[in-house]
């Protein structure tokens, strides 16, 4: 499941940091970038950035702070190559030549266990353990449900439009989809049949042999609710092991900070500023695109929302985030932003909390005081939980 964008604020990317300057490097022709050479002799660290697409079906913006371009280029190339490598391994819906990935596990459901590498096995084990320790509302066994709802969302094809279609166009599309599938949305019968098989008992993990087996034929893993954050956390730790001075990565709605920001920002301003994107609709026009600005140092931030992948039918919005209990898309919140230290956990929790009702959220947040969260409701209100208020800049 994809996340919505968290916007890196212009103040972070473009305003000088006291002892840094700004450069962009072209990392192996992967993106078009320009280069601005600093003439400040007092510069200690310079800022280098790159942008890539393709991995995890999102735009990934990377910024590193280093003293020389060669070192920065090595880190930026590493980030891009590593994201693409992990994207292929963690992909639940596509095969790649010579790669055993999550899709390989799905292809062999009901037939045989699949031997996977440590990174895939650890991702699946992490996801299942988080389900036991935090919430079952994020469930990587919802692959058949994801596939079912994606079939309808693709038929409506709203993702490819820059603006919402007119009411007449929506009615025409709804009639077209109904003629195609017999219903404007998945039927209760289709959903109930799938829900019957969504249980922890349908998956077998063998830690010794590193095999994964889905017992029912047709069962599918969908690790999209965790994979991007998990991959981001892996890359963050690897960058720190390699000795990166400071780095900030925005992978769609996943923000991770690596290294030590205090080395590259002047005293009194030793944090990054990020903006949480506003949902669509008239209730959010007052926010001018951003519902909140947050300051972070080494935390991970992930947002889940309903306003980038959805379709509308019979006057109701159906987003891409599925409640594993009901089989239907969740609609309690417009977006949920979670801040914790681990990006994989932040990814997991942002999905789980998005699916929870207000009363379930209250119970969860009261039981997990270390989790910071920001909830946006359909009427344009913002709710802060944990110590999130300490991270918000301004009103």
What do the PLM-derived regions correspond to, one by one?
Residues 4-8, 15-395:
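Mature catalytic core of soluble alpha/beta enzymes
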């Amino acid at each position: 499941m994809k996340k919505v964008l968290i916007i890196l604020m212009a103040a972070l990317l473009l305003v000088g940091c006291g002892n840094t300057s700004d450069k962009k490097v072209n990392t192996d022709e992967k993106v078009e970038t320009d280069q601005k050479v600093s003439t400040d002799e007092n510069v200690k660290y310079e800022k280098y950035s790159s942008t890539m697409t393709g991995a995890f079906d999102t735009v990934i913006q990377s910024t590193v702070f280093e003293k020389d371009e060669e070192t920065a280029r090595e880190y930026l190339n590493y980030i891009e190559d590593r994201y693409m490598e992990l994207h292929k391994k963690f992909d639940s819906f596509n095969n790649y030549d010579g790669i055993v990935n999550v899709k390989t596990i799905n292809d062999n459901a009901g037939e045989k266990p699949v031997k996977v590498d440590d990174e895939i096995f650890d991702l699946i084990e992490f996801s299942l353990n988080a389900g036991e320790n935090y919430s079952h509302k994020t469930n990587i066994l919802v692959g058949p449900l994801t596939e079912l709802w994606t079939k309808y969302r693709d038929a409506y094809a709203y993702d490819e439009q820059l603006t919402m279609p007119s009411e007449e166009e929506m009615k025409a599309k709804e009639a077209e989809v109904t003629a195609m599938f017999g219903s404007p949305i998945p039927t209760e019968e289709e959903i109930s049949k799938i829900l019957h098989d969504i249980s922890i008992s349908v998956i077998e993990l063998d830690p010794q042999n590193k095999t994964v087996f889905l017992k029912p034929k047709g069962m599918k893993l969908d690790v999209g609710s965790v994979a991007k954050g998990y991959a981001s956390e892996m890359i963050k730790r690897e960058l720190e092991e390699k000795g990166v001075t400071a780095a900030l990565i925005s992978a769609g709605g996943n923000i991770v900070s690596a290294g030590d920001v205090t080395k590259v920002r002047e005293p009194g301003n030793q944090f990054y500023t990020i903006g949480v994107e506003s949902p669509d609709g008239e209730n959010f026009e007052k926010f001018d695109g951003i519902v909140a600005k947050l300051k972070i140092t080494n935390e991970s931030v992930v947002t889940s929302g309903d306003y980038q992948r959805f379709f509308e039918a019979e006057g109701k919005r159906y987003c891409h985030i599925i409640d594993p209990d009901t089989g239907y898309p969740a609609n309690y919140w417009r977006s949920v932003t979670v801040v914790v230290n681990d990006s994989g956990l932040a990814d997991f929790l942002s999905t789980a909390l998005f699916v929870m009702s207000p009363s379930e959220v209250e119970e969860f947040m009261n039981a997990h005081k270390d989790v910071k969260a920001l909830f946006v409701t359909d009427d344009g209100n913002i709710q802060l939980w944990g110590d999130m208020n300490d991270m918000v800049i301004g009103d």
